[in-house]
């Protein structure tokens, strides 16, 4: 894990109930009842997204039989990124990864306080509820889904929507940082406070 934002001029992230926990998973498919988690990462930020700390990144071991069931897109994407090889070499189970991630997060936020933050995060939550249920309960029941702003921006401000280009690396940690950057972009360009009314 790495503190990616602390510097001599910027303090390290401190424990606070308003801190945000960002999460991303890579899976073998989209169905939590038949597919499995193959990578998971977390990043914790302060509420204004100015300070961030990376947590552990885990490739989750899955059997060759499970990996063989992936469709062509997943085989190509995760093969090209090297994730399939990392999954085969890993000895980490879902339960082990969940326990270590929860222990890491406990240093920065109390259970039940942070929403689960990310892009299309409801999908990650479905897999977590199926394969890491105790870890899923660490989060507040609410989600902070950047995809909501994306879809609103696409409909209401299409020019602004087109201004953020994703790299689509499809690795968990890179996708988290991209989600944080995307939310910062919408905050600057889309979530613009109204000008105060002039005095009568």
UniProtKB/Swiss-Prot annotation:
Catalytic-site annotation from UniProt: 141
Entry GO terms, CC: cytoplasm
Pfam families on file: RNase_T
GO molecular function: 3'-5'-RNA exonuclease activity; nucleic acid binding
SMART domains per record: EXOIII (SM00479)
Keywords assigned: Cytoplasm, Exonuclease, Hydrolase, Nuclease
Signal peptide: none
Localization terms from the record: Cytoplasm
EC number in record: 3.1.15.-
Example GO BP: DNA metabolic process
Residue intervals of the Exonuclease domain: 20-183
Listed SUPFAM superfamilies: Ribonuclease H-like (SSF53098)
The keyword Zinc belongs to this UniProt entry's keyword annotation: no
Primary location class: cytoplasm
Function, as annotated: 3'-to-5' exoribonuclease specific for small oligoribonucleotides.
Family: Belongs to the oligoribonuclease family.
Protein name per its UniProtKB record: Oligoribonuclease
Lineage, uppermost ranks: Bacteria, Pseudomonadati, Pseudomonadota, Betaproteobacteria, Burkholderiales
Encoding gene per record: orn
């Amino acid at each position: 894990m790495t503190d990616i934002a602390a510097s001599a001029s910027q303090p390290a992230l401190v424990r606070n109930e308003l801190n945000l926990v960002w999460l991303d998973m890579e899976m073998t498919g989209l169905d939590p009842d038949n597919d499995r988690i193959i990578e998971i990462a977390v990043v914790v930020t302060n509420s204004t997204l100015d300070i961030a700390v990376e947590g552990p990144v885990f490739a989750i071991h899955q059997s060759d039989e499970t990996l063989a069931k992936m469709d062509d897109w997943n085989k190509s994407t995760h093969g090209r990124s090297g994730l399939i090889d990392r999954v085969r070499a890993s000895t980490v189970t879902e339960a082990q990864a969940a326990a270590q991630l929860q222990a890491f997060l406990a240093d920065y936020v109390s259970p039940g306080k942070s929403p689960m933050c990310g892009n299309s995060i409801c999908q990650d939550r479905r897999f977590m509820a199926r394969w890491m249920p105790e870890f899923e309960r660490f989060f507040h029941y609410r989600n902070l889904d950047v995809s909501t702003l994306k879809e609103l921006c696409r409909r209401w401000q299409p020019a602004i929507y087109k201004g953020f280009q994703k790299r689509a690396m499809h690795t968990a940690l890179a996708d988290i940082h991209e989600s944080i950057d995307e939310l910062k972009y919408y905050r600057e360009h889309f979530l613009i406070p109204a000008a105060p009314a002039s005095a009568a």
